[in-house]
Amino acid sequence: MNKKESILREFALLCYFFIVYLLLPKNAKHPLADKSFLDPHPVARVSPFGSRPPFLLMVPSTSVPNASLESGQSSTISPRRQKESSIPVLQASGSVSANKTFQSTESSALHQPKSSSSERTGKIITRQRPHSGPTSPRVTPGELLPTLEALKLQEALDFAQLKLKTRQVRYTINLRSQKLLDTICELNDEKRAEVEEQAAYIFTLQKELVETGYEKVSSYNFTYSRLKQKAEELKYASKKEVAQLVNSL
């Protein structure tokens, strides 16, 4: 039983490690594969193997005097390693200068007294919020005054035209009434009084013209045309026909 249990445990462990291996990403690199973190500043580091490390013995190298060695020995660095080592130094110097310029500009911006936009330009700047949708434009009092003046002028013009037209109608009625009176004088004496009553009715309508407006203008014309027609008929009609015509009015 103990043998079988040990075999089962080993088999379970193998299965567990196999499953973990399958779950791991295939393209993942081991953290020790990238050795750049071991040597962040390769120029300042002194090799523990002396001036010529054993892994660079077969590589052609150029001797560079090392200022950090007090004994006067020279450390040799390969061109490839020298090129790789010079890159981070340049990047570091560039970042330091960039940081210095950024800090200087930031400090100058902080110590500079703030001046509002209204002080610089001398004008009050108002920010308008964007319209969320189509809205009707607002009418200011300055824009409303010309509109009111235009309405007043239009109203005055309409009133003047109405007054002029009223005068024209009154003049026409006076003229036609005078013609009607001339026609009445030519009528028979018996029916002249009745025709004069109709003429008097026209004069009363003339007086009411200003108060009633233009509503009775058509009735004036209609009454005048009828009276004129009757007057023409009364000239050559007999007494019986005149009586019938007057009664029909």
From Swiss-Prot:
Alphabetically ordered keywords of this record: Chloroplast, Plastid
Annotated Polar residues bias: 66-79, 92-119
Subcellular location: Plastid, Chloroplast
GO cellular component: chloroplast
Protein name, UniProt field: Uncharacterized 27.9 kDa protein in trnR-minE intergenic region
Annotated segments matching region Disordered: 66-142
